[in-house]
Amino acid sequence: MSRKLCTLNFTLSGKQGSLVIRDIQLWSNRPTASKSTSELRGQFIQYVDLAKLPLWVRSTNMNTYRCYSTSATAQAYFKSKLRNANRGIVIELFDKVDQRSQEPAYLIIFRENTELNCFQVDLTMKHEFDGQVTKLKQDIGKTRASVSKEGSIDIIIQQSQQRKIGTKTEVYRNVHINDKRLQFNETLSKLILGGLRLRGISNSITDYQKLYKITFDAAEFTHRDELKRISMGSGEEVSFESLQETVETLLKLFTKS
């Protein structure tokens, strides 16, 4: 059951002064501990291309919130600025900080099909990368300080490089796995949307989103073995031709065309 979490107001600054976008309601389908709703305040930072965001910006288990507004100004603003499906609006929150770094928290508002959604930027992986870089610098500093005591600079440098290579290899491996899964999702989504358009199925049709979702889920199930191998780091990307054939078969089945 959906529940209203909070209301967001944020400020747009420009040459003509400031404009406040008001009454953006954030709703969640997940249960939360707090039963009271709050008001968040923030300011517009910039527009971003969602396809070019770093992988650490979004985690696989993060919350995505539905956004609604009864404000005509807010509705007109989002309609104008989010025409591009890959565009996002970055908002810096005044009243909320990242618990780990105590840095400002950020929301990204975007449009998915006909729905307006948002998510909070996940800084967890960024902090892990920063921590690894800091540790590597500390290790190198300790190594240099103890060169004269150890008496063998070659061994010390080799040990330091091995530690760096091991850490980088693990990070690159995880990033590579995430890239493959993200590419699968993006390709699958584009194929489904293209297939629906070719069949003359408009997103204004009542069952459009339902048809999109069941096709997406069925395609994931069809390629579950390949996705499992990808998640273990031992599989190749699902080929475009294979995924296209799967989508065509499913759409023929679901649309009876």
Swiss-Prot record:
It holds the Pfam family Sld7_N. Keywords: Cell cycle, Cytoplasm, Cytoskeleton, DNA replication, Nucleus. The keyword Magnesium does not apply. One of its GO terms (biological process) is regulation of DNA-templated DNA replication initiation. It is found in: Nucleus; Cytoplasm, Cytoskeleton, Spindle pole. It comes from the Eukaryota. The keyword Cytoplasm applies. InterPro entries: Sld7 (IPR016808), Sld7_C (IPR041260), Sld7_N (IPR041564). GO terms for cellular component: chromosome, centromeric region; cytoplasm; DNA replication preinitiation complex; endoplasmic reticulum; nuclear envelope; nucleus; spindle pole. Required for the proper function of SLD3 at the initiation of DNA replication. Binds to SLD3 and reduces its affinity for CDC45, a component of the replication fork. Required for mitochondrial morphology. Belongs to the SLD7 family. Present with 1690 molecules/cell in log phase SD medium. Interacts with SLD3. This is Mitochondrial morphogenesis protein SLD7. It comes from Saccharomyces cerevisiae (strain ATCC 204508 / S288c) (Baker's yeast).
